[in-house]
Amino acid sequence: METVRLDREISQTTVPGGVVVLSERVPSVRSVAVGIWVRSASAHEPRPKMGVSHLLEHMVFKGTERRTAQQIALALESRGGSLDAYTSRDTTAFQARVLDSDLPQALDVLTDLVRNPVLRPSDLELERNVVLEEINTVEDTPDDQVFELAYQTLWPKHSYGYSILGTRDTVSALSTDDLKQLHGRAYFPANCVIAAAGNVTHERLLELLGEQAWLADRETGKGKREAPAAIPVPAAVRGTEARHTKDTAQTHIVFATDSVAYADRRKYALLVLANVFGGGMSSRLFQRIREELGLAYAIYAFTSFYRQVGVTGVYVGTQPKTAVQAEAAIREEYAKLARAGLAGEALAEAKQQTQGQLMLSLESPSARMYRLAGFPVHGEPYQSLDQVLAAVAGLTEEEMATVAAEFFDPARQTVVWLGKE
């Protein structure tokens, strides 16, 4: 078992062939955020099993070998803490936020959820209905649904384009055997990352994890398990437009293109460009589309970085009668940025804005926990905040021009509409 100090208050321990543990001590708070990331999610699903990772994430809360669903709910909430989970494209995560004195209880509950769910057929029928209602909620929320459609258009035949929730048909067909097979295949220490941030030392975290049997070496023999491999991502569909009809007050439009993976250093240039393009009230899109033309209330740029690929784009909601005008104006702004990039004072201001946002985003233990876990689950070596700030500061005009020309080219964008005909 090897422990490395990554920064003044940040440490990482890697068990040979086993779990990765990271922590950041924040002595000024009285709480700890702690989570377990399972490196298996929708990117690992074949189409017929779409949604199985998300359904399993729900089902572990229905009961374990030691706790009922109500006992799980009360275990931390009764102490003022919180317990939650989510499924992304790359990982399934379970996390808690508790008083520092309640960290042993939090780790016990999280371990119980990940290791010992009972996965009963009777619970599946109930929770299946809950997930079907979650799908209904997305379909009743057009500014969510349009993003689902955008991903499907980018990757129509790959799991990155599948709905994380699944479809009504796939969720309805999933069985407890499907859930148990996924749990046995993916939910084991060598496929997990554990991260904590707050008023806890790394030594204390390791002590508690040792008590929960997280620090043993990898299983051997017939029971040995290997982490499931994600399905390789094919090239995204670029430069196409898809229009979907729905009776809505607004037309919802997403521009999107594949970009760079989490570990790609070009992500810093993309973050800076996205900020300038649609990151706030001072951004080009906000000023042009909302302030100058009055075409939208919501207009913003977005970036997401996954283990294998990223997505960069723009969302706007506008009246059906102004949708064509809004799309044309956004394309004009894309063309300007792709052609000119960022230079001089504009680049200096954009760097300062991005650096400030990065620092402000880490003001809570939960945010620090998520950041720590992000490195191993996405395959990037640890980068200190100072290193990230330096990477942003070091961006050159040439780098910005290259990234802008490649990823903000209007001809590259896939555009998806959702609204009235």
What are these regions (language model features)?
Residues V4-D7, A227, A235-R238:
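Short solvent-exposed loop/turn micro-motifs enriched in small/polar/acidic residues
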Residues F255:
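A domain-level signal for the structural core that forms small-molecule/cofactor-binding pockets
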Residues M1-S31:
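N- or domain-start disorder-to-order transition segments that initiate the globular core
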Residues R8-I10, T14, R25, A69-R225, ...:
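Charge-rich, well-structured scaffold segments of protease-associated domains
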Residues H54, H58, H202, H252:
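Histidine-centered active-site/metal-ligand motif
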Residues G18, R25-L76, A150, R265-F277, ...:
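Active/ligand-binding-proximal structured segments within catalytic/core domains
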